[in-house]
Amino acid sequence: MTHLQFDNRLRAELPGDPEEGPRRREVLAAWSAVQPTPVAAPTLLAYSADVAQRLGLRAEDLASPRFAEVFGGNALYPGMQPWAVNYGGHQFGHWAGQLGDGRAISLGEAIGVDGGRYELQLKGAGPTPYSRGADGRAVLRSSIREFLCSEAMHYLGVPTTRALSLVGTGDAVVRDMFYDGHPRREPGAIVCRVAPSFIRFGNFELPAARGDVDLLRQWVDFTLARDFPDLPGSGEDRIASWLGQVCERTAVMVAHWMRVGFVHGVMNTDNMSILGLTIDYGPYGWVDDYDPDWTPNTTDAQGRRYRFGTQPQVAYWNLGRLAQALSPLFGDAAPLQAGLDQFRDTYLACDRRDTAAKLGLAECQDEDLHLIDDLRALMREAEMDMTLTFRGLVDLSPQQPDASVLREAFYDETKRAAQAPALGAWLQRYAARCLQDGASDAVRASRMRAANPRYVLRNYLAQQAIDQAEQGDLSGVHALLEVMQRPYDDQPRRESFAAKRPDWARDRAGCSMLSCSS
């Protein structure tokens, strides 16, 4: 028996749907009561020891068959009261109406050993009123990707939801991976993701779009009371301060994405966390050869709305939709604009901080922004790996700058040779700036190692682990989980996990481009 304690404030304090069960319907309330749909043979495949410890779960809890039953959707611990939340959102720039938790079911809000709140949410636990004709299930490949990325991002220092467990269901799920008329049966799985709150921008957009100001205000009052209890003031001033905090947190999150080369892939407003956490890991990816126009999402391949380089602008646009949703609570738009301005100010400050850290400098001067932009242009022209380039610069000697420290970063020898003179000139500029900074080589290297990861969850690494897991071998998943817990360290005998994308993975499904099929 676990010792988890729940208070489930969302269910207790926000209006619920009078109808229970998964029947698809328009819902005018904040949430709907719905039970997970049982599966054939729930089996624990992997778990996060850190998240389990925060929840107070013991080794015997995790080893118990009851744990797999609960987090596979077949049973409940005392105090759990499952629900799915109602929200809307803008998808690819267009209003999509009611969306909601189509295959996510929250089991409860647990109070951890640190006194913090940990909402436990099963993804792939069956249909809800918001499933929109889908089966509410998830396949093993997408579940592995969400489980691993949730944990990898945490250890990279990126604000994120976490993952407690990955449970195989024993059931097959039919999916058309690229929506091309070739569906296939795939093994099913369920991830338990964990966060203090899963409230999204879309929770406020939907009642605003419906003209339901009462429910909008209830959502705002609840969010302030539960998730932002220390905000001072009252009325419009407090709501404006809250929006400013959301804008700041979102800016910090996206700045971290840009620092480590992460591309979310589906930055719809229903995938934006009110806490500034990375949420909903679908067709995400890490930049391999540097390209600000790259997106991993096949659905976005033509318009490239959510490409790597535009993520800050998209985040700002999404915050504008949140501000618009809150506008019925304000007599004047000026406080809302002031909150939005905090995004730009915070993002620019984070960008300067990260520029200095990635280059190993004590502070970022204006010319350093040009220096790093010129490096990015070189990386693009020479087809250089982003992660390996910045990590390789750690070993550069400012006294004798030598491009050989970047030899592992190139994908194309012809392009390397063509850009060699320009790269050499840039290295001379960078070396001079390091000497001007005055820090020792050891201090500079320490700064850079803390900002430039050695290991990131490249798509091809995740796909290799998925291929093994689909054959019943979870060793690849466990190895990746272990390596990604120390992304900034040089790990002996783990060098293969730091290698750039191999040629075979350039165009392979799951390694370069992914769909939303999951």
From Swiss-Prot:
Binding site for ATP: G100, G102, R103, K123, D135, G136, R193, R200, D280
Active site residues according to the UniProt entry: D270 (proton acceptor)
Class in the EC hierarchy, top level: transferase
Protein origin, superkingdom: Bacteria
Molecular function GO terms recorded: AMPylase activity; ATP binding; magnesium ion binding
EC number: 2.7.7.-, 2.7.7.108
Keyword annotations: ATP-binding, Magnesium, Manganese, Metal-binding, Nucleotide-binding, Nucleotidyltransferase, Transferase
Cofactor(s) needed for function: Mg(2+); Mn(2+)
Region (Disordered): 1-22
Family label: Belongs to the SELO family.
Name used for this protein in its record: Protein nucleotidyltransferase YdiU
Species, as recorded: Xanthomonas campestris pv. campestris (strain ATCC 33913 / DSM 3586 / NCPPB 528 / LMG 568 / P 25)
